[in-house]
A protein has these predicted regions:
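His/Asp/Glu-enriched, well-ordered alpha-helical/loop segment
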Residues: 11-21, 28-56, 60-61, 66-77, ...
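Well-ordered alpha-helical segments embedded in enzymatic catalytic cores
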Residues: 5-9
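Active-site-adjacent "gating/activation" loops or surface patches in catalytic cores
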Residues: 1
């Protein structure tokens, strides 16, 4: 979709009082989605919610630019993340994006910028793409690698969450 098509879809969803979920894995797609939401702001307050929660939910959010993490809370947009993808993608990330590893799943940064776990930071499973094992996402979010990964080998360990934060992200907001 073009940015204008995305903005038009958001406008239609708003007119019907429907929430919108957008799949955006990389930082370009995340930014385009947030930009489309900002374009709609003149007509729709950011605090508009549907019966299912905030108006906009962005699925995956595996790479987010530093400039965009504060925009989630400012726009009342949900970052719906599946941390388990870190475990399945770890070799590809190291091989293809070694210079961008610090931007992979910036979970701590989202929280620090106002995305409270269970409110604007949600975790999900992404079944059937990955196995239905929440332990994988707990490991990925807390260890930032596979079980037993030393901290100095973790991907962006400064983005680690506590188990309590993970439980909140899994349990609330749905």
């Amino acid at each position: 979709l073009s940015r204008q098509q995305l903005a038009d879809a958001m406008q239609r969803c708003y007119a019907l009082r429907l929430g919108l979920a957008v799949h955006a894995i990389g930082d370009g797609a995340v930014r385009a989605t947030l930009d489309a939401r900002a374009q709609l702001h003149s007509a729709v307050r950011f605090n508009f919610v549907t019966h299912a929660g905030p108006f906009l939910r962005i699925e995956h959010c595996e790479l987010i630019d530093t400039l965009d993490t504060p925009r989630f809370a400012a726009m009342n947009a949900v970052a719906s993340v599946q941390p388990c993808h870190l475990l399945t993608d770890i070799e590809v990330l190291r091989r293809q994006l070694p210079h961008r590893l610090h931007r992979v799943l910036p979970l701590r940064e989202l929280i620090d910028n106002g995305c409270a776990p269970g409110e604007l930071l949600w975790f999900g499973s992404d079944v059937p793409i990955v196995p239905a094992d929440p332990a994988d996402s707990l490991t990925a979010a807390t260890v930032r690698g596979r079980s037993g990964t030393p901290r100095d080998s973790a991907i962006a360990p400064e983005q680690s969450l506590t188990l309590q934060e993970c439980y909140l992200a899994f349990a609330a907001g749905r």
